[in-house]
Swiss-Prot record:
Keyword Repeat set for record: yes
InterPro entries to which the protein is assigned, alphabetical: LRR_dom_sf
Name of the protein: Leucine-rich repeat-containing protein 75B
Region (Disordered): 1-23, 284-315
Keywords: Leucine-rich repeat, Repeat
Bias type Low complexity, positions: 11-23, 286-297
PANTHER family recorded: LEUCINE-RICH REPEAT-CONTAINING PROTEIN 75A-LIKE ISOFORM X1, LEUCINE-RICH REPEAT-CONTAINING PROTEIN 75B
LRR repeat start-end pairs: 182-195, 207-220
Role noted for this protein: May suppress myogenic differentiation by modulating MYOG expression and Erk1/2 signaling.
Family listed: Belongs to the LRRC75 family.
Length: 315
């Protein structure tokens, strides 16, 4: 099932440990840098270099198993269960670069897709101001958010606020006294590492009405996904949780099947989640029987990238 949780190759792979530990640029910053370079190479009429960068980006996001024959010749209905928006945009960008429209300048169409990806992969609304003003504003927002009394079904939005260990401790105390009615907790783009989230987890899984936990754009790794999977298996933890957003982190390229199944069991009013593709055949018709992707790739690593077919099509 789904995109593999694979190793990254190339010179950028060495920065993974630093990103996960909270030092160095966040993973989304590296991805945005590649997208901006794709834009510049297309303006310089260097499409081959743009394809190489796109391949790096796809691999970094865990989409290296999405082969071009599927992109070019099949209706790609399968989407990455962690970040379907990025997957859809990357498929469109790959199609654009491999099969440029004859009546339209290549860079214009691809540049638009790159801008959409950059918007999606960054805390765009929080990057409009200077760094010093942003820091003052975010610390003020954190303080005010942790002082208010919550109403039933309310959301606590801490997205874009860089969190320290001390901040996480404040959040833990706040949740223990005010979290009984909390429905959605947004911790996107807060710089959370596995260690910081580990401090929060006991407070989070005790929340009786928490339905959504948003952890997009942080420094989390597969270790966090494993911890969440183990917690979901315990019916006394996260009793109301329906969705976890782990997209755009270090190496969480697909959610493990046990986590998805555990989330589905918490949705008594629905029979399935849109992110569970049971029985979906991802192989072209006539392919070998043993070539299908296993339903769970949790303990496997992606095979090395081989040469991709350079087929093209007229558009």
């Amino acid at each position: 099932m789904g995109a593999r949780l694979g190793r990254r190759a190339g010179p950028e792979a060495g920065s993974e440990a630093g990103a996960a530990a909270g030092c160095g640029p966040a993973p989304y910053e590296r991805r945005v840098r590649w997208l901006r370079e794709i834009q510049s190479t297309l303006r310089e009429r260097r499409p081959e270099r743009a394809r190489q960068l796109l391949r790096l980006l796809r691999q970094d996001l865990g989409l290296e198993r999405t082969l071009l024959p599927d992109i070019l010749y099949r209706d790609v209905a399968f989407l990455n269960p962690v970040d379907p928006i990025s997957h859809d945009l990357l498929v469109n960008l790959a199609r654009d670069l491999q099969c440029p429209k004859k009546d339209y300048e290549l860079w214009k169409s691809s540049d638009k897709i790159c801008r959409q990806l950059i918007y999606h992969l960054t805390p765009h609304s929080k990057q409009q101001q200077g760094s010093s003003l942003r820091q003052r504003k975010t610390q003020s927002c954190l303080k005010s958010s942790l002082q208010k009394t919550l109403l039933a079904g309310e959301t606590v939005d801490l997205s874009g606020i860089p969190l320290s260990t001390q901040d996480v401790q404040h959040i833990t105390r706040y949740l223990s006294s005010h979290g009984a009615v909390l429905a959605v907790l947004d911790l996107s783009f807060t710089g959370l590492s596995d260690e910081l989230l580990h401090l929060l987890l006991p407070s989070l899984w005790a929340l009786p009405r928490l339905t959504q936990l948003l952890l997009n754009g942080n420094r989390l790794t597969r270790a966090t996904a494993r911890k969440l999977t183990d917690a979901i298996k315990d019916t006394t933890k996260f009793p109301a949780l329906a969705w976890v957003d782990l997209g755009n982190n270090v190496d969480v390229a697909s959610l493990p099947q046990p986590l998805l199944v555990g989330l589905r069991r918490r949705l008594s009013q629905r029979t399935s989640l849109p992110t569970i593709y049971e029985g979906l055949d991802l192989e072209p018709e006539g392919s070998a029987a043993g070539a299908t992707t296993p339903a769970s790739t949790w303990d496997s690593t992606a095979a090395g990238l081989g040469p991709e077919p350079q087929a093209c099509c007229a558009r």
